[in-house]
Amino acid sequence: MAISKEDVLEYISNLSVLELSELVKEFEEKFGVSAAPVMVAGGAVAGGAVAAAEEKTEFDIVLTDGGAKKIEVIKIVRALTGLGLKEAKDAVEQTPSTLKEGVAKAEAEEAKKQLEEAGAKVELK
């Protein structure tokens, strides 16, 4: 005997709030989905405030100071960007300079870590 949609709905309607919450969590885990409400594009001004609160996913790596160990920083800049020696040297000496744009968060944080370990000052925007 097959279970109909009506049977499922009837069963769910008889669950307590706690049982329903546990059921939702199990659905999320089993099917890899989220029960978070879907945001609709556009709308009132409040929608813009919510969008600003969302976590940024792309970053620009901006070198604000080359630091004292410029040769090490230039080597790292070349490795990160693929620039030639002269271009990398100019980027390190003429700060602030944007090294990369639209970079994923993990890559941006790793680049910042490498540059700061070499003595440079970096901002992620």
Curated annotation (Swiss-Prot):
The keyword Ribosomal protein applies. The keyword Ribonucleoprotein applies. Keywords: Ribonucleoprotein, Ribosomal protein. Pfam families: Ribosomal_L12, Ribosomal_L12_N. GO terms for molecular function: mRNA binding; structural constituent of ribosome. GO terms for cellular component: cytosolic large ribosomal subunit. CDD domains: Ribosomal_L7_L12 (cd00387). GO terms for biological process: translation. Homodimer. Part of the ribosomal stalk of the 50S ribosomal subunit. Forms a multimeric L10(L12)X complex, where L10 forms an elongated spine to which 2 to 4 L12 dimers bind in a sequential fashion. Binds GTP-bound translation factors. HAMAP family: Ribosomal_bL12 (MF_00368). Forms part of the ribosomal stalk which helps the ribosome interact with GTP-bound translation factors. Is thus essential for accurate translation. This is Large ribosomal subunit protein bL12. The lineage of its organism: Bacteria, Pseudomonadati, Campylobacterota, Epsilonproteobacteria, Campylobacterales.
